[in-house]
Amino acid sequence: MARKEFRYRGYTLEELQEMPLDDVIKLFPSRQRRSLKRGFLPRQKKVLEKIRKIKKEGKTEGRPPVIRTHCRDMIVLPEMVGMTFGIHNGKEFVEVKIQPEMIGCYFGEFAPTRKKVEHGDPGMGATRFSMFVPLK
């Protein structure tokens, strides 16, 4: 079975990439749209400059370089599709390859800051029952 072609609000990825940014912003949900209408923050502009520099140099073929960023509030734009970002989760950089389905989401959604706690087995003396367990 053939894979279904990706569409965002009725537009293909190629159409989204050719559209001016103002038209793409109109397609986003209200929270993202309002955030982008206010303009990009300096750290977001820096990420966009890095993206455009890499695309201009033609390093997008093969395995493009990883763009490391602490900017978790950056919104995924169509021009970012296919690139790899190292998004900081507070401890380390989580590598995320941007897929078309991620358009309109925040970077922070793909690098969770907390992980599930996995407790080990209780040790000796951890419970009252352990008094009756013979030591090995």
Swiss-Prot record:
The biological process GO terms on file are: ribosomal small subunit assembly; translation
The answer to whether the entry has keyword Manganese is: no
Q: Name one GO cellular component term.
A: cytosolic small ribosomal subunit
- A Gene Ontology molecular-function term? structural constituent of ribosome
Q: Which InterPro entries match?
A: Ribosomal_uS19, Ribosomal_uS19_CS, Ribosomal_uS19_euk/arc, Ribosomal_uS19_SF
- Tell me the keywords, alphabetical order: Ribonucleoprotein, Ribosomal protein, RNA-binding, rRNA-binding
Q: Which superkingdom heads the taxonomic lineage of this protein's source?
A: Archaea
Q: Which Pfam families match?
A: Ribosomal_S19
Keyword DNA-binding in annotation: no
Question: What is the role of this chain?
Answer: Protein S19 forms a complex with S13 that binds strongly to the 16S ribosomal RNA.
Give the family this protein belongs to, as stated in its UniProt record: Belongs to the universal ribosomal protein uS19 family.
Q: What is this protein called?
A: Small ribosomal subunit protein uS19
Q: Which organism is it from?
A: Methanothermobacter thermautotrophicus (strain ATCC 29096 / DSM 1053 / JCM 10044 / NBRC 100330 / Delta H) (Methanobacterium thermoautotrophicum)
